[in-house]
């Protein structure tokens, strides 16, 4: 308790000179701050392209065409049929295919040099490409580790990859 009170006293001495500023209506200050934060977030969000919408791949610009056959999807998808059909129509049309964002793939290099690709999101896009029998799908590769994979799969994650 002595340790904490030391810092509280030091803080209170520093802020004593700010008397008139601290007497302002706190809710007014909080409202201004949150409004400013919301405006900044909206500006940031509108400046981002639609392709950079995921947490994992927001900083990755490079898109690859990855063979569907090498992608592992360990968690079964729960799909909205209308969404899959809509995506299929968009993908079929060559001019609008670019509107479909790439999926994120966790890319894990095996201990003996093999590459493994795991997909946990993009279920509807993956299913649309699969039903259209496309050999490849647009993807952003997120370099990952077995530890990252463990976060998704828990104890079902493989202990090692060759």
Curated annotation (Swiss-Prot):
<comment type="similarity">
    <text>Belongs to the sulfiredoxin family.</text>
</comment>
<keyword id="KW-0560">Oxidoreductase</keyword>
<keyword id="KW-0049">Antioxidant</keyword>
<keyword id="KW-0067">ATP-binding</keyword>
<dbReference type="GO" id="GO:0005829">
    <property type="term" value="C:cytosol"/>
</dbReference>
<dbReference type="GO" id="GO:0005737">
    <property type="term" value="C:cytoplasm"/>
</dbReference>
<dbReference type="GO" id="GO:0098869">
    <property type="term" value="P:cellular oxidant detoxification"/>
</dbReference>
<dbReference type="InterPro" id="IPR003115">
    <property type="entry name" value="ParB/Sulfiredoxin_dom"/>
</dbReference>
<dbReference type="InterPro" id="IPR036086">
    <property type="entry name" value="ParB/Sulfiredoxin_sf"/>
</dbReference>
<dbReference type="GO" id="GO:0005524">
    <property type="term" value="F:ATP binding"/>
</dbReference>
<feature type="modified residue" description="Omega-N-methylarginine">
    <location>
        <position position="38"/>
    </location>
</feature>
<feature type="binding site">
    <location>
        <begin position="122"/>
        <end position="125"/>
    </location>
    <ligand>
        <name>ATP</name>
    </ligand>
</feature>
<protein>
    <recommendedName>
        <fullName>Sulfiredoxin</fullName>
        <ecNumber>1.8.98.2</ecNumber>
    </recommendedName>
</protein>
<keyword id="KW-1015">Disulfide bond</keyword>
<dbReference type="GO" id="GO:0034599">
    <property type="term" value="P:cellular response to oxidative stress"/>
</dbReference>
<dbReference type="GO" id="GO:0032542">
    <property type="term" value="F:sulfiredoxin activity"/>
</dbReference>
<keyword id="KW-0488">Methylation</keyword>
<comment type="function">
    <text>Contributes to oxidative stress resistance by reducing cysteine-sulfinic acid formed under exposure to oxidants in a peroxiredoxin. May catalyze the reduction in a multi-step process by acting both as a specific phosphotransferase and a thioltransferase.</text>
</comment>
<dbReference type="InterPro" id="IPR016692">
    <property type="entry name" value="Sulfiredoxin"/>
</dbReference>
<keyword id="KW-0547">Nucleotide-binding</keyword>
<feature type="modified residue" description="Omega-N-methylarginine">
    <location>
        <position position="24"/>
    </location>
</feature>
